Amino acid sequence: MKLKSVFRSVLKYRKTNLSLLLLITYSIITLLYIFDHERYKLNLPKEDEHPEFNDLLETAWGDLQIITASFHPYTSKENDKVHDYLLKRVLEITGNSSFASVSDDKESERSILFQQQDPFNESSRFSRVTYFESSNILVKLEGKNPEEEGLLLSAHFDSVPTGYGATDDGMGVVSLLANLKYHIKHRPNRTLIFNFNNNEEFGLLGASTYFNHSWSNLTKYVINLEGTGAGGKAVLFRTSDTSTAKIYQQSVKENPFGNSIYQQGFYSRYVRSETDYKIYEENGMRGWDVAFYKPRNLYHTIKDSIQYTSKASLWHMLHTSLQLSAYVASNSLDTADQTPACYFDFIGLKFFVISAKTLFYWNCIFLLVSPVVAIGLYLISRDRMTWKSHSWLSWTRFPLSLAAGIIVQKLFSNDIIRSNPLTFSRNYFWPISAFFTQVIFTSYVLINCSNFFFPCADMKSLSIIELFIILWTILLFTSKLLYSSDYRYTGLYPLSIFFLLSTIAAILRLLALALGMRTRKRLGRECRDHHSNYSSHSQIDMERDGQENLEQPQDQFTSSQDDQASIQDDNVSTTSAGPSHNVDEDHGMDSSSQQHDERVPLLKGSNSMEEGLSTRENSLKLEYTDYAWIIQFLLIVPIPSFILFNSVDVIMDALNHTVQEGSKATFDVLRFGMVGSILIALPILPFFYKVNYITISLTALLFLISASKTLLVHPFTNSNPLKVRFSQNIDLSQGNAASVHVLGREGNFLKPMLQDLPSIKYSSTHINCTSVTNGMELCMYDGMQPNLLSTNGNTNISSMVKVHVLHNNRNSTERSPYEPIVAELLLEVKENRACTLTFESRHQAKSPVREITVYQKKNSAPQKANITKTIKSASGINELQLHKLDFDKETYHIGVQWFPKLLTDGNVEDDKLGTKDELSVSISCYWGEYDSESVVNGTAVRKIPAFDELINYAPLSFSFTNEQKGLVIVKDAIIL
């Protein structure tokens, strides 16, 4: 009997029990979160257990150390060294294999000329033509069954000028080498192609060149390995459809990591990056984009090095790609379901997949069936007289308290914008915590104040039903979004799970009422809508403890009579909190509204008073023996809280550093933080008003700490620096001044840092800082001259870029006025690999250029002076990008054809000055080597001393990356 009493006491709906259960729930969620983020570090292969895997990892780590020894962008000589090392490793691995073939684009002098939309800005209408000389290394492993559609594995070996490329994309490259080594030993059933491609960073050009190779016809599937962060776990960033997601599910059994929230965020352009997967997808391939994704403030900086990553991160990508490639290479694939997929993993133990279209159908079923069932049960309970009547005040307090929490949250967010808008960059936990605690604390205060003056007998059940209604509305809206996006909003699945579990909890409550015993006596209104003068001190205390769950005796989830008898131990006060009423037994209506004071029980009418108190007492006792709340709690709180918290963490973990990329991203992150904190709070709001004073005190304390951290702590530290973009621009048409451009977020961050540089502090150098678009700030000053070339004389920067016009028939009398104009240019640039030509006409709205020709002199064919590549565009060409491999080949030979104004608009105008058909050509050439030296007059000097100065003297709370494809840009302009 004692044990039974203890058991009942533990399960009763009390403040302490609820608070303890909340503590346990959030403790478990925290432990699961830590387990999820740390487990992969403990799963490295051991030599005695998995010798082959251990060898693959150790060899890959050694390869990574070698290829990340220096910066190796496409525009550098180090890029060739990495290419040569990879080619050597590929030849070592393939050896004399009878089914392996190697193709080197550099040796075969493969080049392409093609029209390309800006891959990093889909909204751009700038027409671009790109010429690219490739040094991709391709390996073909012919499968046992070559009729099977082949699999491509791809990674790029170039880095940015400011990063060693350990994560982006050294780990992908060495993982490809490990996969190649594995599949050489275990011949695949289907043909595998490995593409070690070059120049992904500035146009996804290596991937584009792949489709100029005959082997591209052999492959249908692709695994792209990428790094858009700097370490951590490699996530399934995106996948083609439900079939490919299920293939990942079936193959990656150890440490799967993926979430379709990333996919939706990436396609929605919340992340301003792109990977080679885009090119493969646009060319009809299906597959998997596996990438590192955080932290973005170290991405493309000097900290993208082997020092800031680990073998655990490398093994996670290597092992994931190995499991996936081995499965695809050896199994027949079911690829029938090509609808977008919703997918997620559970702490790296289990991977779940559902078609977004199927999810939409289930949403429709939920939306249709749930209100029908709920309304039906409500009508049954009304008919059986088991439904409790509630006033409008009772029904509105939960949504109004939620609305008030949102309003207060909005006011707090305004304070963040005013005082510390970039706080998310340092630590998104504090603002999320502040938003979350503020919402639940506001709800607690308002509901309990309302209950103090106007007690509500069944607040929990009302709140659960209202939560169901709110979530039904949200699900309706998100289902519409899912349908209108052609099922590409694949990150909305958490709301479907939350709605389903909340619906079950609400239906169970309504079912209990519908199946309750019919009663003739109605207890009247359980929620008092007016304040009574009669109220004892003990009763007020009990009301504060919560009268919200006065269950009817007929409730299927209430205790037995035995339980009710044992309630005496609880010492529940029997004094009414409101006026005594005589209850009409047939209709449940009050027959007296007489008010009483402390003397009333001694006077006439005391019998009526005692009857009311007795009824009230019995009802209040039932509150403490209500065990249904545990079922409702377990349905609504643990699973939805974990899924919603994990989803918000996924979003913030990927996006929090994007606040450095502009004000739009800042508002996006702030909005996600606000909405996410509300979603995390929703599962506990129906219960939270019931927590004890310790819990609410800790909540208030956590809010104060979180708000202080959010508003007052500086957003940038050594470990979470502000990423700043650098370039040094020399415009030959305006002199030889080497103007340094430093681009970063507004907020008085850049100028104080620049003013402390020695070259500025001890000179009269002026810094000009101006606001540019999207909340960014550009600071410019004249920096130290770069030393791009080794020379024995004075460095003449104007000799770096020279433009020679070989032919121009614009003013030729032999050309008809209706005939296109043709010009031929020779662009002489020293030790260079990349230039851009931009075309513009002062007299025509659109670029009149219709045809571009590139004359290429091949080393392997000296008998052919030039090989021409030509491309035409009826809509006009705005830009020509040039990329060549040979540093010793100092010229680009270009042909340009453009329409005269007469052909484009049909107007015949007098052109006395002969300028209406002029074509302005702006030339920009790029150099990306900075961590090296030139020899000037016998003395070794650094190539870009202005950048060295920033690296050496800027505080550690700053990190630096390139603004454009080179660190030094030399510009010139001519008119044709």
From Swiss-Prot:
Signal peptide interval: none
Membrane topology: Multi-pass membrane protein
The organism's place on the tree of life at top rank: Eukaryota
Compositionally skewed regions (Basic and acidic residues) per UniProt: 582-601
Cofactor(s) listed: Zn(2+)
Active-site residues, Swiss-Prot/TrEMBL: E200 (proton acceptor)
Gene3D superfamilies per the UniProt record, alphabetical: Zn peptidases
Topology Cytoplasmic: residue spans: 1-15, 381-392, 450-461, 518-627, 690-692
Alphabetic keyword roster: Glycoprotein, Hydrolase, Membrane, Metal-binding, Metalloprotease, Protease, Transmembrane, Transmembrane helix, Vacuole, Zinc
Vacuolar side: 37-359, 413-428, 483-496, 649-668, 714-976
Residues that bind Zn(2+) 1: H156, D168, E226
UniProt-listed Enzyme Commission number(s): 3.4.-.-
Enzyme class label: hydrolase
Biased composition (Low complexity): 559-570
Sites annotated Transition state stabilizer: Y299
Alphabetized Pfam families for the sequence: Peptidase_M28, PFF1_C, PFF1_TM
Start and end residues of each stretch annotated as Disordered: 528-610
Subcellular location: Vacuole membrane
Glycosylation sites: N96, N121, N189, N212, N217, N656, N768, N796, N811, N866, N937
Function according to Swiss-Prot or TrEMBL: May be involved in vacuolar sorting and osmoregulation.
Protein name, as recorded: Vacuolar membrane protease
Species whose genome carries this gene: Saccharomyces cerevisiae (strain JAY291) (Baker's yeast)
